[in-house]
Regions:
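Membrane-embedded multi-pass helical conduit in multi-pass membrane proteins
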Residues: 58-107, 394-479, 493-564
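A conserved acidic beta->alpha catalytic loop
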Residues: 181-188, 204-205
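Short, acidic, metal-binding catalytic loop of nucleotide-sugar glycosyltransferases
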Residues: 142, 164-175
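Cell-envelope/extracellular polymer assembly enzymes that use nucleotide-activated donors
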Residues: 146-148, 176, 322
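The conserved acidic donor/metal-binding loop of glycosyltransferases
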Residues: 229-233
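Long helical/loop segments within the catalytic core of UDP-sugar-dependent glycosyltransferases
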Residues: 201-224, 236-317, 328-329, 350-390
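Catalytic donor-sugar/metal-binding loop of nucleotide-sugar-dependent glycosyltransferases
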Residues: 324-342
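N-terminal membrane-anchoring/stem segments of glycan-assembly enzymes
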Residues: 2-137, 192, 387, 397-398, ...
Length: 615
């Protein structure tokens, strides 16, 4: 019985491959209990608002406490603590402000009116397509609009791609589904043919995912287009809940949440619940500042807005946030639709989590160093500047735990303290939990329970963010990796040796600190912090052991049939010919050149619909 309950609780990604499109605007109700509770409860409960207000008070009280000059200790540890704490206080304040800004917001009357007119039941009846919602024409401002659905593929398993494509094709509203294959796979091409969707691959790989999309926009000419990663399965009402926002000609894109269905181990649960706060509260609040940004998948774009900035931004692996900020600088509006309209996979290994966070953090630091939102050259409103500055500095909160680990070490070995001994223990007991305790309580209320996995990942991710900081500072290019996909066969320890050595050193420091306290006849607070840091580092090491053991068992049960990332499953196309410019986006929109080159290579031979598109 307990095994059955666990399987229901941690159900994997919703399978929409056999979705029945005959039920008008139906949702597939395949929710685990946690998902159902989230979907049937309001985002802002009275308890949540109370805890948020108390957390805000805790932020201000703790700030006043740590900035009191009389409490200052030795300079070096004091500077470390002040720097880290002020970063955390700033980000906590921004999160609370943004979250409370979105309180009580509902879809506008304008959206509801456009949604009511999106489909024409009388016309559908005359055309005898009432029973097939995938063929229903969509209308905005009394004119028919067309939508392309672009599914970016880069070596994912065929069964994952098939499920995603079938769900995309089953969405209500007339649209055209495309597979954008950057893995040069004949198997994917054959899958597209068997499913009846369109397929395109390009000659070359410049611009990574952004280049792949720009290349497809040369042949996919719809007024609007949707982007899905290969592992995100759309619900049938995706277009119904997003296209009506485009009734406002100033809206550049409509972003929807990333919801995960594979929360079945420590890493995936930690990574998934970290993102839940962002999508349930932060992004909706950013709507009020016109600063909600694209996250790369589950998003509807207006083609004219993308053309206005020269195409999806290709000069960064974090093309999504760069594209967003460029659009906002051009005066476009963005919308975050908080309804959960697609289900995908979050990283479930230390490798995939590390690569994802490295890419995201590098993109944030790149903006800070090369396109700082606070610069007078940025054409943003002040509230947009503040929101984007909070975004690109967010990953400093991941570096802070690593720096704070140095503080008890300095006290144990050098007798250097961040605060004077005049600070009583009960003062710490009042102000410290008032800040950190309320933050943890707030996260627990949002998630519905205390999630120790979130703390585990937060405490152990500092090497990733330090590397991202220097990658951005020194302009080191990082290899593209697919977000949400399970990593390769490498050991988890290949991606966390810094944490392993930190654990060994912290364990030794804890032993020294305990012996020191025993010799002096009293317990020092540094011992507590050493033991706590040792515990979190050790727990991460154990997580790596468990992950390696599980993957070894899986390999013993069956052969790994997943193709390597970015390696062609068949003979690749001529890699010397590029279809996407590395520096000038508009060249990626030259449809005739792309079609001629692909036709010459036989890429379109298996899919005559693309030839028809050209004609």
């Amino acid at each position: 019985v307990s095994s059955s309950r666990r399987s229901r609780r941690h159900r994997s990604k919703v399978d929409l491959s056999t979705v029945n499109a005959n039920t008008e605007l139906a949702l597939v109700d395949d929710l685990a209990p946690e998902e159902r509770r989230a979907s049937t409860s309001g985002r802002y409960s009275p308890t949540l608002l109370l805890v948020a207000l108390l957390a805000s008070i805790g932020v201000f009280a703790y700030t006043a406490f740590i900035l009191t000059p009389a409490f200052r200790g030795d300079l070096i540890p004091w500077l470390i603590v002040m720097t880290c704490e002020l970063i955390l206080i700033f980000q906590a304040s921004m999160a609370l402000w943004t979250m409370l800004s979105g309180y009580g917001r509902q879809p506008s009357y304008r959206f509801q009116t456009a949604q009511a007119k999106l489909f024409n039941p009388q016309l559908n009846s005359r055309l005898r397509i009432n029973s097939d919602p995938t063929k229903w024409p969509m209308y905005l401002n009394d004119r028919q609009v067309d939508v392309d659905v672009l599914i970016t593929v880069y070596g994912e398993p065929l069964d994952v791609i098939e499920t995603t494509v079938k769900a995309a094709m089953a969405m209500h509203g007339r649209h055209t589904t495309w597979i954008l294959d950057d893995g040069d796979s004949d198997e994917v091409r054959d899958l597209a043919k068997s499913l009846g969707c369109r397929y395109v691959r390009r000659l070359g790989s410049s611009g990574a995912k952004a280049g792949n999309i720009n290349n497809a926009l040369s042949v996919a000419k719809a007024e609007f287009f949707v982007i899905f990663d290969a592992d995100f399965v759309a619900k049938p009402n995706f277009l119904y809940e997003t296209v009506p926002f485009m009734e406002d000609s100033n809206v550049a894109f409509v972003q929807t949440p990333q919801v995960y269905g594979n929360l079945n181990n420590i890493v995936s649960r930690g990574a998934g619940f970290i993102q839940m706060v962002f999508y349930r509260f932060i992004q909706p609040g950013r709507n009020e500042f016109n600063a909600a940004f694209c996250v790369g998948t589950n998003v509807l774009f207006r083609r004219a807005a993308v053309k206005d900035i020269g195409g999806i931004y290709t000069q960064s692996k974090s093309e999504d946030i760069w594209t967003s900020i460029l659009m906002h600088e051009r005066g476009w509006r963005s919308i975050f639709q908080p309804k959960e309209l697609a289900v995908g996979d979050t990283p479930d290994t230390i490798e995939s989590y590390s690569k994802q966070q490295l890419r995201w953090a590098t993109g944030g630091f790149e903006i800070l160093f090369t396109h700082n939102p606070l610069s007078p050259r940025r054409r943003l409103r002040m509230d947009q500047r503040i929101m984007y500055f909070a975004t690109c500095t967010f990953y400093f909160t991941g570096i802070a735990p690593g720096l704070l680990m140095l503080v008890p070490i300095l006290e144990v070995f050098f007798d250097l303290r961040p605060v004077t001994l005049a600070v009583k223990w009960y003062e710490w007991a009042l102000f410290y939990p008032g800040f950190y305790g309320m933050q943890i309580l707030l996260a627990a209320v949002i998630a519905g329970t205390f999630r120790w996995e979130v703390l585990l990942l937060a405490a152990n991710s500092f090497p990733i963010y330090i590397k991202a900081f220097f990658n951005a500072l020194l302009k080191v290019d990082t290899k593209w990796s697919v977000t949400g996909a399970t990593g390769g066969k490498a050991s988890a320890f290949n991606f966390m040796m810094v944490q392993v050595w930190a654990f060994v050193f912290m364990l030794g420091t804890s032993i020294v600190s305990i012996y020191r306290d025993y010799s002096m006849g009293h317990v020092n607070i540094a011992t507590f912090w050493c033991l706590l840091n040792t515990f979190f580092l050790g727990a991460f090491v154990v997580t790596a052991f468990l992950e390696n053991r599980q993957r070894k068992q899986e390999r013993n049960r069956s052969d790994d049939t997943r193709p390597k990332r970015g390696v062609a499953a068949s003979d690749p196309l001529d890699s010397n010919k590029q279809l996407t410019s590395e520096t000038k986006h508009p060249e990626a929109l030259d449809a005739e050149a792309i079609l001629d080159a692909q036709a010459a290579k036989g890429v379109l031979a298996e899919n005559p619909e693309l030839h028809n598109r050209k004609g």
